[in-house]
Amino acid sequence: MRVAVGMSGGVDSSVTALLLKEQGHDVIRVTLRFHTVEACEVNETHNVCCSPKDVQDASRVAKRLGIPHLVFSWEEIFKSKVIDYFVEEYKRGRTPNPCALCNREVKTGFFARYLKQVADIDKLATGHYAKIEEDKKYGLVIKRPKDRKRDQTYFLSLVRREDLELLTFPLGAYTKEEVREIAKRYGLEVAQKRDSQEVCFLMGKSPGEYLEGILGKQRGLIKHVSGKVLGEHEGVYRYTIGQRRGLGISYGKPVYVIDIDAKTNTLIVGEEEYLYNDKLLVKEINFHVPLEKWENVSAQIRYRHKPVPVERIEKTEEGFLVKFKEDVRGITPGQVVAFYDGDVLLGGGIIEESVK
């Protein structure tokens, strides 16, 4: 089988290539460059997966394994599909998840179809901690990995169902410690390389700092849910639902961001009780499994949140209304909601709003 391995220069993708080569597959390594070389060189001190050193690491590992290494410069595609979306969502007072969108529109689903055409691959493999398996009940699906601490299925919930047959995630059967041990055993230089922890195009900046450089300061009011004005902010794009720190106001007791009104440039804050709700609206769901087959459904509204049992999902004129069996804290417009039956990823969508 001819397999392309998406390569960032880190230990995960390096071991992915190694495992596939050991299994006897025809392996090529492919690296997507999303940023200009100049930008990456200026910010090489930050732990992001784009620098010239990362590309060099990828090339060294490919040479060590005796496989070809191709580099694609997709700066414009990445900007139009991910960065522009990121900026527009924040302008609307929402909190997007650029990594989930990138997996769908650029480096996983879209890239697999592109490589199928230009390189005649059978599969695209990445270093994601997830599994793609044939499930007796649901068919071909993504499942949670062995290493639950590294579980990346949430970020894959927007990948199109038709792209799953082109993808494979070999690391789903390993823990991170086992992956590093394999790299060490085979003498790969990247065995102890640090993981990339940041949104790559932010280059070490916070979202607020990055967006201020594009949008400038946009001062507006901070209001309590009661209507009382408590202070001013320098841009609603600096805040997300549930945020407490950095508000710069004094109220006598803790208050959190409850809502963001981008039209009036107003930040709404209130006590923690206002963060809880049991319903959300999703305009569209990306189905890995048809809705009528879903059973024992739980939903995860942020990457580090635990899944919460779902009571029902109703199709409405506005989209899909999701009703939880209990109140959920911090439902955030723009974030991804991923749906599961146990370990099986059923699908996902982008939260439109919290519904009272």
Curated annotation (Swiss-Prot):
Keyword Thylakoid among UniProt keywords: no
Localization terms from the record: Cytoplasm
UniProt GO MF annotations: ATP binding; tRNA binding; tRNA-uridine 2-sulfurtransferase activity
Active-site positions on this chain: 102, 200
Catalyzed reactions: S-sulfanyl-L-cysteinyl-[protein] + uridine(34) in tRNA + AH2 + ATP = 2-thiouridine(34) in tRNA + L-cysteinyl-[protein] + A + AMP + diphosphate + H(+)
PANTHER family attached to this UniProt entry: MITOCHONDRIAL TRNA-SPECIFIC 2-THIOURIDYLASE 1, TRNA 5-METHYLAMINOMETHYL-2-THIOURIDYLATE -METHYLTRANSFERASE
Protein name: tRNA-specific 2-thiouridylase MnmA
Organism, scientific name: Aquifex aeolicus (strain VF5)
Lineage: Bacteria, Pseudomonadati, Aquificota, Aquificia, Aquificales
Gene that encodes the chain: mnmA
